[in-house]
């Protein structure tokens, strides 16, 4: 399973639309779309740059809703990443209903602890939207298992502590963590943060992961080389995971 990340509106919303359509045809199994945010604590330099560019170009939520309407017919599931402050200001139930109406399958909220998510969980359950929880190498075993059981779609395992980026060193506990999660859930496990090379994809697969999430590398290629180069590169990365 290859999950490709795009920042909505970077470098512009039409390019995002084109990228979604082409990645869906070139091997992405899931496309994660990040909502630009000025205080995205989990973002490294590349994704911060992408968010800043989108916001400077005047991105607002109407652009997101229009984008989702225009790519609604693709067969690849869409997942939205947004920070809770964005969701809260828009209105939690209104936000969830909007995503479901646009055929979005999952929601990632990186700054919302599970213990503080009761309202969002209840609303998502009501409308059939999956929350995808993040599990890191520093998450204690009991909490990791609780989060794994709460995931109804796939599980996002962070390869190391810190922010997103192209840094390639994975935490040494990752293989063990994947094994422990496999004991308590049948949900697919995808590894993200720092994945940008075919060799890494093959290594992650050898650890038992069911997928990889590629964000910073996708946005770097998109911003520097364009949609066609990104879609061809994704095709190569997909073949590394599924030869």
Swiss-Prot record:
Subcellular localization: Plastid, Chloroplast
GO MF assignments: tryptophan synthase activity
Pathway(s) per entry: Amino-acid biosynthesis; L-tryptophan biosynthesis; L-tryptophan from chorismate: step 5/5
Active-site residues (renumbered): 32, 43
Domain of life: Eukaryota
SUPFAM superfamilies: Ribulose-phoshate binding barrel (SSF51366)
Disulfide topology: none
Catalyzed reactions: (1S,2R)-1-C-(indol-3-yl)glycerol 3-phosphate + L-serine = D-glyceraldehyde 3-phosphate + L-tryptophan + H2O
Any one GO cellular component localisation term in the record: chloroplast
Principal location class: plastid
Alphabetized InterPro entries for the sequence: Aldolase_TIM, RibuloseP-bd_barrel, Trp_synthase_alpha_AS, Trp_synthase_suA
Alphabetical keyword list: Amino-acid biosynthesis, Aromatic amino acid biosynthesis, Chloroplast, Lyase, Plastid, Tryptophan biosynthesis
Documented EC number(s): 4.2.1.20
Quaternary structure and interacting proteins, as annotated: Tetramer of two alpha and two beta chains.
Family: Belongs to the TrpA family.
Biological function: The alpha subunit is responsible for the aldol cleavage of indoleglycerol phosphate to indole and glyceraldehyde 3-phosphate.
Identification of the protein by name: Tryptophan synthase alpha chain
Organism: Cyanidioschyzon merolae (strain NIES-3377 / 10D)
Gene of this entry: trpA
């Amino acid at each position: 399973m290859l999950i490709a990340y795009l920042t909505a509106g970077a470098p512009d919303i039409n390019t995002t639309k084109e990228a979604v359509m082409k990645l869906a045809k070139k091997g992405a199994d899931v496309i994660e779309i990040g909502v630009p945010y000025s205080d995205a604590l989990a973002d490294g330099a590349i994704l911060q740059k992408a968010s800043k560019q989108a916001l400077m170009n005047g991105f607002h939520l109407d652009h997101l809703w229009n984008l989702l309407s225009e790519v609604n017919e693709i067969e690849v599931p869409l997942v939205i990443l947004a920070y809770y402050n964005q969701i809260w200001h828009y209105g939690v139930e209104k936000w969830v209903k909007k995503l479901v109406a646009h055929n979005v399958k999952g929601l990632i909220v990186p700054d919302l602890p599970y213990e503080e998510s009761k309202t969002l969980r209840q609303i998502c359950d009501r409308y059939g939207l999956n929350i995808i929880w993040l599990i890191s190498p520093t998450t204690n075993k009991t909490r990791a298992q609780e989060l794994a059981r709460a995931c109804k779609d796939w599980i996002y395992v962070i390869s190391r502590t810190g922010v997103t980026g192209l840094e390639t060193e994975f935490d040494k506990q990752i293989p063990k963590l994947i094994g422990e999660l496999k004991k308590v859930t049948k949900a697919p496990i995808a590894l993200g943060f720092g994945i940008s090379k075919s060799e890494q994809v093959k290594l992650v697969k050898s650890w038992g992961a069911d997928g990889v999430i590629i964000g910073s590398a996708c946005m770097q290629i998109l911003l520097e080389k364009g949609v066609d180069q990104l879609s061809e590169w994704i095709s190569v990365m997909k073949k590394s995971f599924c030869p």
